[in-house]
Each structure stands twice: as C-alpha cells, then as structure tokens.
C-alpha cells in the first residue's frame, strides 16, 4: 500500500483567509500540534513576505524536529536566500519554489514568454538545490496550463534538482475526472517523473477540493497539500482531516495510507479553530459537533443494535470521545497529566494560571469537560508580550427603560489602572464603546460571534470578534462564565493584538533604518 506524504499549509495558505492573523507563538503552538498529529511536511510561512513571517518560520524550524519544515519562495534568488536563513536550522530543510505556468498568468502577471518562464524556473530550482536537500517546484495554476508546456517545464525543473513537483488547482476550477487525466498525463509522458514525487494542491471554490485531492492520489500523486478545517483564502483549501479519514476508511479503494495519528485530528481541529477564531460548522465532516450525532429514531434504534448500521467512522478514530470530566476535588498532578494529554507543554507558571482558572470554574460548574479545558488553555496561553491592557473590573447596568451603561477598569503594562464608563444601545455596545474610549483606538466591529463551550446552563461562554484597524482586520477571543465578561475579554484581546502588531512593525522598521 502506497504511503502518501501529508503537506500541511494551514500556517501559510490557510492564514491567508480573511480575518486570520496569528502571532508567532500561536503559529508555533499549531506547528507543535501538527507534529503530534504526524504531519510529514509543515509549510510554516512565506519568509520573504514579512519580518513576522520570517520569524515564525525560523522559530518553528528551530523547535519542531519531528516534521520537515518548509517555506514558500517565489522563483527569485532573494526569496530563496530568505527561506534558507529561516529554515537552515530545520532537521530536514526544504523550500517550496513556485512560478505561474498558465497562459493567462504568464502573459498578464509575469509578462514573460514561455521560454523565459522555463529559464527562470530552471535558474531558481538549480539555485535552491545548491542550498536545500529538498526542493519542491509548484507550477502555479497548473490546471489551466497547456499540457505540452507543463510537460516541458516539469522535465526541466526535475533536471535542475526538484524532488517534488506540485500541480495546484489554484482557483478550484477542475473536476475530479479532469484532475485524474492531468496526473495520468504527467505520469505517462514526463520522461523523468520517476525522479520526483507528484503533489496535489486543491482549492475548494466549487466544493471539490477534497474530491480532487483524492482523485489525484488515485492517479499517482504521492503528496497531498491541505489545511486543517479546510481554512484558506476564498472558499478555502482541501481539508486535511477529510482526506486522511477517507484514505483510512476507503483504503480498499485507494490502496494508499498516511502516517498520521488520526486520534489527534479532533484536538488539532479544535486548536486551529480557537486560535484562528474560525468556528467549525456543526455538520462538518469528521470534526463537526454533529459528525457522530444521530437524531432520527430509526437511526438511533439501529445504532443501539449495532453501531455499524449508520456509523462508518468511529469517534475514537479521530479522537472525538470525551474522557471522564475533572471536578473540584481533582489535584494539581492529575490536572497537569490531563493537560499534557491534551497537548499542553507550557511552563509551570502558565500551568498554575490555568489551574487557578480551573478551580474558579469548578466553583461554578459541577463538571469541567475537555472542551472547557481547551478554552481555559487558549485563554491563558495568549502572548503576554501583547497584553497592553488587562481587564480587572467590569460592571454593566441595564433594564427595559434604562440606557445600558458599562463601567470598566483596566490595568496597563506599567501597572497603572484606569477607569471609565460609557453607554450604548445594548450591553455589548456599551462595553465596546467604553473600551474604545479607554484604549484610544479608532476600531470598528467587523464580526461578533458567541458560542457555549459545551451544553448546559453552567456552560462557559466563548466570544470571537474581529475588529477593523486601519487597513487590516484583527481577531480576538474571550472565555468566561458570563457572556458580557467574555465579550469584553474578546474585544480587549483583539485590541492588544493590534497594538502588538503595530509595535512589532515599528521595531522592524527601526532595524531596517539603522
């Protein structure tokens, strides 16, 4: 049975999704979880695109050793040099060089002739191969490229040193049948294809990203590029969890498998969802809240008699089962053991912070579940360097015939406390108007979402917001037993991240000028 390499691009292509802006520490946390999942290759970012991306790729390359780390680079020596500086400490450095090959891209974007495109591809791949032991060449918009030209440039790239050839459906246009024909053509007609691994990368614009990826695997692809929860620009990318489970459940058909630890899928999905503030739909295949729910009486009866009547995927396979909940009598050692099982690897100081929050929650809830713990971990592991303001007190007064008023106290980084009151048409607006006044930012609320971490009257509230700040959007999240407190925390989290992002940009600009 063939082994399919899994190339996760959640931290690069996935982060291009509008509203996602991860910090370096958040990217590192996701990368560590991808390593635990068993991902073969992690595309950590685009080092030449910004100082922040460079730093994230560099830190991930220095920290994660169980997966191969790669970075994106245009077919330019400066991009490849930047990628090398960021990735050279990786256990197995590799670079992902891309160049457009479709007529529309060559003519209107690159403004190059086909001969010039081949020349640039060869030059860049050869240069990259002098530095990196593994070079991947992507023919951008391959699925709208002319096949004879595609054959020519693939052969040239392999001769120049490319060990992986990626054929992306950049705009999500093709059908599974068309993808199959393309990969069969390349496999049968590219004379030196035996010296490279074929890779597939599919977008989901027509809802066929996963189907196209599986079709490519059937037609000879040995590597699949995908993202957790299918995140990505426009309609997103092919979802890693769906591809992996499809190959597992239908191994009889595909005769292929991954090396993933599938029991980490649910945990990985939850982490990415929380850090990106992108909710997973309840009916999402494999990792959605309803993926293993059966409401129909006939279905429930069948499930009680034999689970295989209506369940082709077990919750245990993807790690969707909930273990026994913790309670107020649980000790620190048992709590630490449980957090380690969930993938937490923070300092003792951070552990104590989460443990204290856990004990406070136990006073309000009879049972604390894994979902609660995930929320507490996410709330406590934010980058402390970005905490310009901390919420210390919140009081909201409202009634049917009264104007909602919020009184808020914040602590600044220098430990000074400030207090302010403000009004709004509703309680949440009163809170946000007051916070905007206190932080001095000209922010507009782009999105506000609330969800309970789990069911029940005593459930934790988790609020996700996106605020518009100048020319970019920034997400924030807040968790609390009270929805108004969670709302305040979410807004403040987003504001703190905006401030940290601006300070970082100023520091990098100062370095350049000096």
From Swiss-Prot:
Residues 390-514 are annotated as: Regulatory domain. It is found in: Cytoplasm. The keyword Transferase applies. Its EC number is 2.3.3.13. It catalyses: 3-methyl-2-oxobutanoate + acetyl-CoA + H2O = (2S)-2-isopropylmalate + CoA + H(+). This is 2-isopropylmalate synthase. Pathway: Amino-acid biosynthesis; L-leucine biosynthesis; L-leucine from 3-methyl-2-oxobutanoate: step 1/4. CDD domains: DRE_TIM_IPMS. Signal peptide: none annotated. NCBIfam families: leuA_bact, PRK00915.1-3, PRK00915.1-5. The lineage of its organism: Bacteria, Bacillati, Bacillota, Bacilli, Bacillales. It comes from Shouchella clausii (strain KSM-K16). It comes from the Bacteria. Catalyzes the condensation of the acetyl group of acetyl-CoA with 3-methyl-2-oxobutanoate (2-ketoisovalerate) to form 3-carboxy-3-hydroxy-4-methylpentanoate (2-isopropylmalate). The keyword Nucleus does not apply. InterPro entries: 2-IPM_HCS-like, 2-isopropylmalate_synth_dimer, AIPM/Hcit_synth_CS, Aldolase_TIM, LeuA/HCS_post-cat, LeuA_allosteric_dom_sf, LeuA_bact_synth, PYR_CT. Belongs to the alpha-IPM synthase/homocitrate synthase family. LeuA type 1 subfamily. The gene is leuA. Pfam families: HCS_D2, HMGL-like, LeuA_dimer. Mn(2+) binds at residues 13, 201, 203, 237. One of its GO terms (molecular function) is manganese ion binding. Its cofactor is Mn(2+). Homodimer. One of its GO terms (cellular component) is cytoplasm. Residues 4-266 form the Pyruvate carboxyltransferase domain.
């Amino acid at each position: 049975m063939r082994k399919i390499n899994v190339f996760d691009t959640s931290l690069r292509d996935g982060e291009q999704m509008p509203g996602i802006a991860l910090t370096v520490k958040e990217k590192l946390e996701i990368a560590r979880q991808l390593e635990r999942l068993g991902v073969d290759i992690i595309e950590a970012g685009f080092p030449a695109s910004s100082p922040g991306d460079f730093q994230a790729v560099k830190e991930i390359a220095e920290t994660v050793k169980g997966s191969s780390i790669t970075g994106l680079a245009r077919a330019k020596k400066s991009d490849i040099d930047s990628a090398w500086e960021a990735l050279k400490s990786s256990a197995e450095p590799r670079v992902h060089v891309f160049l457009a090959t479709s007529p529309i891209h060559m003519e209107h974007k690159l403004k190059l002739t086909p001969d010039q495109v081949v020349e640039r591809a060869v030059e860049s791949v050869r240069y990259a191969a002098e530095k990196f032991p593994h070079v991947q060449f992507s023919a951008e918009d391959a699925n709208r490229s002319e096949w004879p030209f595609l054959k020519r440039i693939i052969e040239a790239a392999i001769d120049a040193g490319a060990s992986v050839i990626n054929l992306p459906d950049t705009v999500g246009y093709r059908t599974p049948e068309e993808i199959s024909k393309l990969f069969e053509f390349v496999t049968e007609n590219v004379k030196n294809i035996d010296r490279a691994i074929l890779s597939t990368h599919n977008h989901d614009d027509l809802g066929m990203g996963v189907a196209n990826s599986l079709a490519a695997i059937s037609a000879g692809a040995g590597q699949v590029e995908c993202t957790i929860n299918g995140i990505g620009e426009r309609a997103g990318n092919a979802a890693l969890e769906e591809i992996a489970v499809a190959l597992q459940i239908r191994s009889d058909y595909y005769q292929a498998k991954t090396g993933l630890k599938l029991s980490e899928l649910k945990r990985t999905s939850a982490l990415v969802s929380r850090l990106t503030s992108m909710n997973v739909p309840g009916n999402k295949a494999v990792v959605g809240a309803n993926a293993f729910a059966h409401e129909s009486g006939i279905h429930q009866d069948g499930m009680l008699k034999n689970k295989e009547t209506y369940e082709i995927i077990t919750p245990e396979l993807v790690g969707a089962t909930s273990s026994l909940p913790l309670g107020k009598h649980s000790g620190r050692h048992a709590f630490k053991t449980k957090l380690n099982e969930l993938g937490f690897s923070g300092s003792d100081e951070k552990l104590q912070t989460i443990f204290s929050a856990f004990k406070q929650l136990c006073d309000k809830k009879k049972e604390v579940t894994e979902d609660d713990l995930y929320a507490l971990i996410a709330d406590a592991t934010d980058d402390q360097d970005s905490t310009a303001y901390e919420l210390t007190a919140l009081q909201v007064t409202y009634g049917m015939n009264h104007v909602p008023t919020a009184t808020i106290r914040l602590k600044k980084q220098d430990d000074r406390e400030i207090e302010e009151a403000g009004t709004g048409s509703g309680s949440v607006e009163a809170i946000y108007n007051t916070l905007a006044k206190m932080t001095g930012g000209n922010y507009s609320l782009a999105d506000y979402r609330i969800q309970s971490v789990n069911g029940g009257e005593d459930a934790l509230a988790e609020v996700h917001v996106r605020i518009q700040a100048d020319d970019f959007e920034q997400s924030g999240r807040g968790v609390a037993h009270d929805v108004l407190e969670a709302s305040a925390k979410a807004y403040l989290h987003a504001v703190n991240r905006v401030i940290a992002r601006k300070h970082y940009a100023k520091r990098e600009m100062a370095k350049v000028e000096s």
